[in-house]
């Protein structure tokens, strides 16, 4: 009996290890299709656009546009394209059109490490 119990716990441990590794990367990840995604906590109605904080769950971004008729969403994509040195068409809102918790997808070929480094640099400017 002990062998069976040990065998099942090994199987569980092996499946848990890969699952816990990706969330440790933080708010910037790669989706199954290979695109880089960024979890955003939007703060619309601010005086100026800025990356306010980087947490393990999301990147806090202040948006200088009102949260009505998608203005803040468009401004968020424009601002992130400027910060990340990408074309505006390469930064698209994937989820969260009417929520403060958003997911932005980057269609350009870049790595999560490069994106995180640029976001950290922008956050330190404030």
Curated annotation (Swiss-Prot):
It comes from Mus musculus (Mouse). Keywords: Phosphoprotein. SUPFAM superfamilies: YggU-like (SSF69786). The keyword Mitochondrion does not apply. This is UPF0235 protein C15orf40 homolog. The modification Phosphoserine is found at residue 89. Belongs to the UPF0235 family. The keyword Signal does not apply. The lineage of its organism: Eukaryota, Metazoa, Chordata, Craniata, Vertebrata. Pfam families: DUF167. Residues 1-32 are annotated as: Disordered. InterPro entries: DUF167, YggU-like_sf.
């Amino acid at each position: 009996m002990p062998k069976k119990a040990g065998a099942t716990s090994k199987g569980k441990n092996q499946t848990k290890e890969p699952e816990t590794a990706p969330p440790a990367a933080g708010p910037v990840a790669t989706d199954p299709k290979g695109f880089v995604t960024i979890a955003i906590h939007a703060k619309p109605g601010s005086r100026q656009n800025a990356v306010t904080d980087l947490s393990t769950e999301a990147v806090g971004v202040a948006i200088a546009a009102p949260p009505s008729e998608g203005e803040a969403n468009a401004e968020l994509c424009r601002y992130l394209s400027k910060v990340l040195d990408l074309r505006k068409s390469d930064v698209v809102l994937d989820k969260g059109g009417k929520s403060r918790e958003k997911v932005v997808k980057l269609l350009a070929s870049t790595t999560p490490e490069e994106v995180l480094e640029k976001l950290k640099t922008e956050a330190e400017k404030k």
